[in-house]
Amino acid sequence: MSLMFGKARTCNIVTVPEHEPSEVNIVILGAMGSGKSALTVKFLTKRFISEYDPNLEDTYSSEEVVDQQPVLVKVMDTADQEGPVNGERYLGWANAFIIVYSIDNRSSFEVCQQYLETVSLYSKGLQPEAPVILLGNKVDMERYRQVSKADGAALALRFGCLFFEVSACLDFLSVQHIFHEAVREVRRETERSIRPLFISEDKSAISLSSAPPLTACYKELPTPATAKLVTVKSSRAQSKRRAPTLTLLKGFKIF
């Protein structure tokens, strides 16, 4: 005897997007002397430091508002002595990476390539992916430039990440923009990782012994955009934004 049921009701299952992350972990990577700590402290305090301990690695937090959304930004200022050798401590922690080189130091640019390869290999297949920003620092040293802007843009294009050039000792808003853009990229990746699932079946009579299984249909979301060369422009209006709440730990001399 086969059991028969009447008309099945249409079923729609939709994935509901999660709330935007209220906390974003950003890891700063790069060769020693590239300006990682200077960029971190500039973002946190709006000041440029002239001295710091290159062997100090620590994590700092700042309450920010990005696109009218509050977010707690945690920044890990790393102090790798030999490049990307022991990255376990930050790879699993990070939501985003900012990889820094100095435009007046070609070897720091080559170290960046190693970091990009390490992060790219780790992030492959992760959902959501951890976005990466390639950052050329010390544009105030233009006359000593060893890495052209075209070289930086080409490397970013190769790894599909954003690319900027700034100076930690000059404009604060340009540095702030980099960190806020990292937050935006994390939010975008979170949205991309949500794949809506739609199931719809409408049969007048379905037999348990012969009814085919329901098949889930997935709609693929667009792939992330490739590298973009961004020119950061300051705005006096932006300077009226609320100053971030800062948690700054030991190891820095602020001037």
Curated annotation (Swiss-Prot):
What reaction gets catalysed by this protein?
GTP + H2O = GDP + phosphate + H(+)
EC numbers for this chain: 3.6.5.2
Per its UniProt record, what SUPFAM superfamilies does this chain match? P-loop containing nucleoside triphosphate hydrolases
Tell me which GO cellular component terms the UniProt record holds.
plasma membrane
The record's listing under Pfam families reads: Ras
EC class? hydrolase
What is an example of a GO molecular function annotated in this UniProt entry?
GTPase activity
Which residues of this UniProt protein bind GTP? 30-37, 77-81, 137-140
Q: Which domain of life does the protein's organism represent?
A: Eukaryota
Q: Report the CDD domains cross-referenced here.
A: RERG_RasL11_like
Key words of the record: GTP-binding, Hydrolase, Nucleotide-binding
Q: Which NCBIfam families match?
A: small_GTP
Q: Which family does it belong to?
A: Belongs to the small GTPase superfamily. Ras family.
Q: What is this protein called?
A: Ras-like protein family member 12
From which organism does this entry originate? Danio rerio
What gene makes this protein?
RASL12
